[in-house]
Amino acid sequence: LITVNGRSYRSRTVPVVGICLDGTDPSYLQAAAGVMPNLTAMAAKGSRGVARSVIPSFTNPNNIAMATGVPPSINGICGNYYYDQVTGTEVMMNDPKYLRCPTIFSAFVEAGVPVGVVTAKDKLRLLLGHGLNGICFSVEGVRKGAVPDSARRIVEKIGRPAPDIYDPEISVYCIEAGVRLLETEKIGLAYLTTTDFVQHKYKPGSPEANAFYARIDHFVGCLDQLGAIVAITADHGMNDKVNPDGSPKVQFLETLLVDAGFREARVILPITDPYVVHHGALGSYATVYLGDGNTGGARGFMEKIPGVELVLDRSEAAERFQLPADRIGNFVVLADRSTTLGRTPSWHDLSVVESGLRSHGGLHEQSVPFIFNRQLHPTYSSKLAAGEANNFDLFDFALNGVQD
């Protein structure tokens, strides 16, 4: 057994491939079932259910929870972006210095198991690859010519240029890279994580979404045919966040607080990342710093804002969502299914989402698929059926829960 972060994992005799299909609400796969014969067959012979994502339902916290097997309260990664109160600066949470524990991947490499990690988004590469002496690269990096020596054979075998970050094919390339990884290297454990451009732009069942999932299905089928244990989940779901006229539905929280007299209010939007075309930095989760202001009055004020669903103070949020208390504000605010939280109108470039906004971050994007191409042991299948699985249990299920 390989023990990391208080959880023990078996290494398996066949490759184990964990896949995060970024932004894939279960409804995408249901709507695309007719064009996903491989996934349908895998789930029929294996196991299928729905798991919970970490809140905030954003990319970094969920990918790192899956990579470490533990929630943000332990691994430290509670957003794509956070406010460092020590330095007084707002920073992207992409640097491994923010990680507070090792990954499953580095622990497996230390135990002598060869590991491969492929991410579409380069922003995840350093976090996922921390302490990993193995294959770890991003498709975004390949496009920019940054191909590590360990990945050259894989990239050559794919034999086509890496797509742009705003091209649906970048995620297809990522999953195909997993196939070529298994074909060219002796891999014990792999993790493939895509990007959610398609889900931000197209609804479940749309021709564009179904065409995308049909492409993904082809390479998922290849992984299955190679004899791997395949485990599929997502980092979060996705919902429309629009007014009746189709414009983005936003409450500019910092503006509202300052105008109401909470002069020192600073709103941090942990969805913030380099990919503003996806979401305009608008999601359904925010954390609020109030300085020395009247925190009691602020809570009552925010709870009355239309579209705000839940306001928790620091200790409540840390306990309920298993978050690191020192990396969130005085309050955590979650919006309802169709509302996003902004800072100030001038802080966002709304032109990138004027044709419509689909986003995530709140409680309504917490349901994610949990699919395995093998049967699960009864204790695991009953946990999944009861809705008690977290997406960060992915490798526990794949390594320990899958029947031989």
Regions inferred by a protein language model and the residue ranges of each:
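A residue-level signal for conserved active-site and pocket-lining positions in enzyme catalytic cores
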Residues: 22, 66, 108, 178, ...
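Active-site-proximal N-terminal segment of extracellular/periplasmic enzymes that hydrolyze or transfer
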Residues: 1-47
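His/Asp/Glu-rich, glycine-adjacent segments
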Residues: 67-203, 209, 278, 284, ...
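Short, structured active-site-proximal loop/turn typified by the sulfatase FGly-forming signature C/S-X-P-X-R
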Residues: 29-72, 116
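Structural motif
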Residues: 18-20, 189-193, 231, 332, ...
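Anion (oxyanion) recognition and catalysis
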Residues: 43, 108-109, 224-225
